[in-house]
Amino acid sequence: MSGLGKRFVEAGYTDLKPFIPVDGKPMVQHVVELFRETNTLFICDQIHSDKLNTICPTSKVFHSVHRGLGPVDAVMCAESVISDEEEVIVSYCDYGTQWDYKTFLADVREHLAEGAIACYKGFHPHHLGPDCYAYVRENDKWVNEVREKTPFTTDKMNEYASNGTYYFRTGRIMKEYFKSLMETGESLNGEYYVSMAYNHMIAKGMRVRVFEIEKMLQWGTPYDLEVYKMWSAYFHEKPRRRLRMPGITLLPMAGQGNRFRMQGYDTPKPFLPIRGQMMAVAALRDLPETDSTTVISLKSHAVGQYFPGCKIVELAETTNGQATTCMAALDDVDDNTPLTVTACDNGAMYDPDRLENLMNDGSVDVIVWCFTNNPTGKLYPHMYAWLDVDDSDSIREVSIKKPFATKPNTHAIIGTMFFRKAGVFKAAYKHIVDHDLRTNGEFYVDNLLQPLIEQGYSVKAFPVDYYLCWGTPNDYRTFLYWDDYHSSSH
């Protein structure tokens, strides 16, 4: 804990990184509670002492001066107070973990390992981004090599990565190989990382074990922490009242779901499970209730049994876009009927009072639901339509599947729109067909917006509090990951 947490300071945090609140308690307290040990040594600046004594009253604090040489150097500054004979775990202070500590200790002791690294492998959402960590090349859970900040393959998710927990059978072993690392000058950007000491141990014939954890909670950067806090806040939210709105809801779900099929999903995307119900049903239940609902689906999907009380429009084949799919259900809908169009692959949590006020404003012709805070927009910016919004939430411009080059990309469409009159939708659709206004060769509902804005219609953005994207395999897996974590007793 001798680092300065510079990125968090630059991001505007006033608390020192280890003491930033996460789920109601300081970040470092989560780390301390992973081990449930009484013999804990904090290596940190003197100003941390009082807070640390509160978090772990049985702990000791070694005051160090920040030298910028990394965690190995910080630990070696305190070598005089670390026992040579006892087991030692060196842990970073900026992560959470779902695991069984007793099983970890039993495993390393049973296998007589001189060292061990707690690792994760497979799908973990923070690995979707560009950041890299400490990676392990292993055979049958025995480490062959460790590489810091650089994976061994192009598929980093399927390599073991360290969570920041490092075990040594004795303090003597740890000190010897920390010294060896520093003597060889093997640093990265001027810092000596704990993980790299294991290569020196392995070269001398010592055995280093991999222990696989269940979940890795990455809090090491402001972005990582904000992503975690967003998901945590959503899963701790209480249910909100469901609005009642006039008109009809259209749920088009007549696509092929190619991205899911290419990744081995046999079940069509709208039928995949979300918290015990079908994805498309979950999407509808997050919306206001309207007078009626029409589901537009491929005939081969036979969806009628899943939507009792809804009108079903079956198509023989896919259309040239979502907007065209919607038009297949609008022939017998009066032009003055309010219309809500939504996607089948996302959920949302929103302020019902704010939406109700917007609905009651008769001057607003179109309401576009959007998000401002979901990491999927940063990871996949070219998959969204972006909105240029003024201070009153009026939309000035729409850029579809292409972020703005000279404007901030703060608002992205989530796939739900309200048209005060179905006739406005129909006329806008005719306009984009007549002018061949497509995106990626298709007529999207998003394509209707820019012509309506240019024709003088009042088109407003409605930012939701939480956007739940299930539209791609990675988005779907991300939701399931956090749902599983927050549903379990961790």
Regions found by a protein language model. Give the residues of each.
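Conserved N-terminal catalytic core of the sugar/cofactor nucleotidyltransferase
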Residues: 7-9, 13, 21, 25-103, ...
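A structural signal for short hydrophobic beta-strand segments in well-ordered beta-sheet cores
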Residues: 19, 135-138, 210, 271, ...
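A short acidic, often aromatic-flanked loop/helix-cap motif at beta-alpha or helix-coil junctions
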Residues: 66-72, 123-126, 216-219, 317-322, ...
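Alpha-helical elements of Rossmann-like donor-binding domains used by nucleotide-donor carbohydrate transfer enzymes
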Residues: 76-77, 103-104, 197, 227, ...
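Conserved core of the sugar-phosphate nucleotidyltransferase
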Residues: 98-185, 349-435
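Conserved alpha/beta core of the MobA/IspD/sugar-nucleotide pyrophosphorylase nucleotidyltransferase superfamily
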Residues: 159-249, 335, 410-490
